[in-house]
Regions:
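Mature catalytic core of soluble alpha/beta enzymes
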Residues: 2-343
């Protein structure tokens, strides 16, 4: 689950402005997908058949949606969520790959990433049809301890098994459900990038809901550049622009979706281990990685862990991450060793 992620549109427009292209007009297209939008920009490809590319990209995204959507009752994931415990449920290799990637990060972060956290998200009114807002007058009361305890009984990544050989999922408790919205968009971005490369394209930037991957260079021969947003709720403001060279980037933040109640702020970033919204000073985490699956998978759990534990975890696993925290004298910015080496 992610905030209005900040690296493109909202940030696509920022990236477009940063590019300031002076060469030939680039090819671009986009459309709705996964409850958000996708965008493709292709540079230095005068012979590319844009219409055919768009058809192929949208067919690819439709297939991923058919596999991993929780909005569609007929998707693989929705059918698995209705299945009984204790039995292997056959899924596509793609779904098994994404779940396995999420489970690996869950283990490395001590459960800070948990794709079974949906009941807790809904309990705090941050589900797909429950928009967290920043209106202090919004009638909202935090759930009771009993309600939290009941919801936590149906949550836990350790209650989920995945196998890649003869791909399948298995739940250990009947009420367990899986939601891949915290990582599936990154996987879809990687798939779009692979499709473009298979089509002979070398210079492009692709994005879904703020998850970005770039290859090659812009029309003017310069590296692609993307914006990292300053983590403030009142307005959209660029903190920095970075060059993205054959890499992916993703940002998680706690400053767009939240409730206020009795003078207390409740973010949509839920700590699966406590069942409650995080309350530390860390406002956003940006991750750069070779794949968007990796970048998308790491940003939220590092944010959940907070400014100290998250940073230590990122250092331990050589994650290129930028931590921006709130401080009494403004922002405190802390890059990991891998971030400094990479950028």
């Amino acid at each position: 689950m992610r905030t209005g992620v900040v690296v493109m549109l909202t940030s696509w427009l920022v990236a477009e402005a940063i590019c300031n292209v002076v060469a030939a007009e680039p090819m671009r297209f986009g459309g709705p997908t996964m409850g958000t939008a996708y965008h493709v920009r292709i540079a230095a490809a005068p012979s590319a058949d844009v219409k055919r590319l768009q058809v192929n990209v949208e067919a690819l995204l439709a297939e991923i949606d058919r596999q991993m959507s929780t909005y569609r009752p007929d998707s693989e994931l929705s059918r698995f969520n209705r299945a009984p415990a204790g039995e292997w449920f056959a899924v596509s290799g793609a779904t098994a790959e994404v779940v396995a990637a999420a489970q690996a990060i869950s283990k490395k972060t001590g459960g800070a990433l948990d794709v079974t956290v949906g009941p807790l998200v809904r309990l705090w009114h941050f589900g797909p049809k429950q928009l967290g807002i920043k209106d202090a007058d919004t009638p909202f009361k935090p759930p009771t301890d009993d309600a939290l305890a009941a919801a936590k009984e149906s949550v836990g990544y350790r209650n989920l098994d995945v196998r890649r050989d003869q791909p399948a999922l298995r739940k250990q408790i009947d009420k367990l459900e899986v939601d891949l919205s915290s990582i599936a968009p990154g996987y879809a971005v990687d798939c779009m990038a692979a499709l473009l490369k298979e089509s002979g394209l070398e210079n492009f930037m692709v994005e879904i809901g703020g998850e970005v991957r770039a290859a090659g260079q812009r029309d003017d021969g310069q590296p692609w550049r993307v914006a990292i947003e300053r983590p403030i709720a009142e307005r959209r403001e660029m903190y920095a622009a970075i060059e993205l060279v054959d890499a992916a980037i993703s940002t998680a933040g706690d400053y767009r979706r939240f409730f206020a109640h009795d003078g207390r702020r409740y973010s949509h970033i839920i700590d699966p281990t406590t069942g409650r919204p995080v309350e530390h000073s860390l406002a956003s985490v940006t991750v750069v990685a070779d794949t968007c699956l990796e970048a998308d998978g790491w940003d939220t759990p590092l944010l959940v862990l907070g400014p100290e534990r998250g940073f230590e975890c990122a250092e331990q696993h050589s994650v290129a991450a930028l931590f921006i925290s709130r401080g009494e004298e403004g922002e405190a910015v802390r890059p990991t060793t891998a971030w400094r080496e990479r950028l």
